[in-house]
Regions:
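Short acidic alpha-helix initiation/capping motifs at coil-to-helix transition points
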Residues: 1-2, 37-38, 55-60, 90-95, ...
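Acidic/histidine-rich alpha-helical segments that form the ligand environment
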Residues: 125-165
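Conserved alpha-helical segments that form or flank metal/cofactor-binding pockets of metalloenzymes
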Residues: 56-58, 85-105, 109
Length: 198
């Protein structure tokens, strides 16, 4: 795939991109920021693409910073939703980056493989199954069905229910952007992180 919007290398990022990156860090995080590790993929292709429009990047990062670091859901629950959206949408970049974050959040390799099958795969807890079903329903219909809502509401509070919807929405938008802009996988992505097409 050839990028429709070529990513800017970091040395060409406009100064406003620093504000956009800072917006990823909410003032009251509930979850830790990822460790600074030079061996981890840096996501330069998506960040370099967003650097073409730093005002948009800042606005999206403020929203995404909540989803990643201030959400009332656990990181594991968040990553179940993100990876399911990435798989259903065929968003290889999103999938590849979030396999790493999913493992950091406690997802096992077996669970990551089962995300491809979805909520009907054996072995999910009732809540995990409801989260995956909610992701599928939101992507397909922009609405969580009554049955799935009841299953979620039996274990999640109001803020968590809201965070479910906004997490799926955040990564649905990002999947659309990455696929439409033609964002390519980064060279520093370790082998075996790529998702087969849905």
């Amino acid at each position: 795939m050839t990028p429709r919007i070529p990513p800017l290398p970091p040395e060409q990022w406009p100064p406003e991109m620093n504000e956009a990156l800072a917006a990823l860090r909410p003032p009251n995080p509930r979850h830790p920021f990822p460790p600074r590790d030079p061996s981890r993929p840096k996501g330069l292709n998506i960040l370099g693409t967003l650097a073409q429009h730093p005002e948009l990047a800042r606005a999206y990062h403020s929203f995404n910073g909540h989803v990643l670091f201030a959400s009332t859901m656990s990181p594991r629950q968040r990553e179940l939703l993100v990876l399911r959206v990435a798989h259903v949408r065929g968003a290889e970049y999103e999938w590849s980056q979030h396999v790493i974050q999913g493992r950091d959040a406690g997802l096992t390799d077996d669970e990551i493989v089962r995300i491809h099958t979805g909520p009907e795969a054996p072995g999910w807890s009732t809540l995990d199954r409801a989260l995956l079903t909610a992701a599928d329903e939101l992507v397909a219909d922009a609405r969580i069905s009554d049955g799935t809502w009841l299953a979620l509401a039996s274990e999640l509070d109001v803020r968590q229910l809201m965070d479910v919807v906004f997490t799926v929405g955040a990564y649905e938008v990002l999947a659309m952007a990455m696929r439409s802009f033609g964002v390519e996988l980064d060279d520093d992505l370790p082998p075996g992180r790529k998702s087969p097409s849905p």
